[in-house]
Amino acid sequence: MAPAGMSLRATILCLLAWAGLAAGDRVYIHPFHLVIHNESTCEQLAKANAGKPKDPTFIPAPIQAKTSPVDEKALQDQLVLVAAKLDTEDKLRAAMVGMLANFLGFRIYGMHSELWGVVHGATVLSPTAVFGTLASLYLGALDHTADRLQAILGVPWKDKNCTSRLDAHKVLSALQAVQGLLVAQGRADSQAQLLLSTVVGVFTAPSLHLKQPFVQGLALYTPVVLPRSLDFTELDVAAEKIDRFMQAVTGWKTGCSLTGASVDSTLAFNTYVHFQGKMKGFSLLAEPQEFWVDNSTSVSVPMLSGMGTFQHWSDIQDNFSVTQVPFTESACLLLIQPHYASDLDKVEGLTFQQNSLNWMKKLSPRTIHLTMPQLVLQGSYDLQDLLAQAELPAILHTELNLQKLSNDRIRVGEVLNSIFFELEADEREPTESTQQLNKPEVLEVTLNRPFLFAVYDQSATALHFLGRVANPLSTA
């Protein structure tokens, strides 16, 4: 690899070391100059603001207006181009933003049991989507709202100086780079191993004016931004319209409830993510297999099976095992299974925390025959509820200073993340010959009882998804 690549890898390792030393509720990672305004950009902003006319605004088209479907292949091609154009500093910025997203995601996920109670089905959360949604709102925020959002995103500020401020455009561009780095790796022979699509829906009351620079800025995060207007006075009807619109445009399973909204709400800011991972060398078993939800209850579920040399570690002290299944050279699926089903909550607390990636250093290669459920999961959550449950400042209360988003009075009804997550077999290229299956050194790993999973990309140090599967056939 070229020296620049070695320098990038070394610097990322340094950033990881700094991250490991972080303590307390806030995460302080150096160097922050990668994501804050520098003196030059601050001077340019000051000059621009001095004689700047009012930002142009527009009223979004009605939600019933005809809209072209999202072309996911074109979206993936755009992400690949983004990744191809990244220089060393861009990759460092992506790695830093990836780690910041991890820390926020762990904290949010860590409070999920208090919000959802015991999860009897399956649930999935995206740290990068959480971070991207809050960074998008930061783009439209001013004054105290911006201060609080910046603190939640993990970037400290000492004063009101511009050079202490988070640069939302840099952060959103870095988030798109994080997505691009994941997708670009699996594009050999025009066959995508991984698919990751993000769509932002900005749903407003019919009279609300959006500022064009805000909507244009969101395109740095994802090219697909859908501003639409609708009546919120009948919340059930509004939620149904949003769901119908998003399913028509994307074809994904979505969920919009507007349970936290009121009839005078004027904004629902929703982020939709679709992930599809193909498990190289795995095949779908001919018959469904038993999955034990608990000691006395089982369900029949479609199962995937494959064999290869995978990284593996069994923790005898805390009674869980980890298997790392590669998607690409640097992206992988982490499967975490308690040795005893009753220990799922304990293992979740041990592994899904800020220093949890340290145990990845203990993994070693093993020849493994792996059997696991085929996963098709949908999860939706309102960030207002999650942040409140995580005891973070109530930054997403109904009335915020979002004057960079709109000059009109805004009452936030919902800040939704909706995840559509799929794992499927990719039988084009077997990982290793199945003739080895009966050899004594082959380790049998069967996920037929509750387990945890994560999708991790080393190239951006980003955990794209964290999930818990207590029953593959139902969502929490």
From Swiss-Prot:
Keywords from the UniProt entry: Disulfide bond, Glycoprotein, Secreted, Signal, Vasoactive, Vasoconstrictor
Pfam family, one: Serpin
Record CDD domains: serpinA8_AGT (cd02054)
PTM statement from Swiss-Prot or TrEMBL: In response to low blood pressure, the enzyme renin/REN cleaves angiotensinogen to produce angiotensin-1. Angiotensin-1 is a substrate of ACE (angiotensin converting enzyme) that removes a dipeptide to yield the physiologically active peptide angiotensin-2. Angiotensin-1 and angiotensin-2 can be further processed to generate angiotensin-3, angiotensin-4. Angiotensin 1-9 is cleaved from angiotensin-1 by ACE2 and can be further processed by ACE to produce angiotensin 1-7, angiotensin 1-5 and angiotensin 1-4.
Major subcellular site: secreted
Record field: transmembrane: none
Subcellular location: Secreted
Disulfide bonding pattern of the chain: C42-C162
GO CC annotation, single: extracellular space
Cleavable signal peptide: 1-24
Gene Ontology terms: biological process: positive regulation of epithelial to mesenchymal transition; regulation of apoptotic process; regulation of systemic arterial blood pressure by renin-angiotensin; response to angiotensin; vasoconstriction
Glycosylation sites: N38, N161, N295, N319
PROSITE patterns reported in the protein's UniProt record: SERPIN (PS00284)
One MF term in the entry's GO annotations: serine-type endopeptidase inhibitor activity
Similarity comment: Belongs to the serpin family.
Function: Essential component of the renin-angiotensin system (RAS), a potent regulator of blood pressure, body fluid and electrolyte homeostasis.
Name recorded for this polypeptide: Angiotensinogen
Gene responsible for this protein: AGT
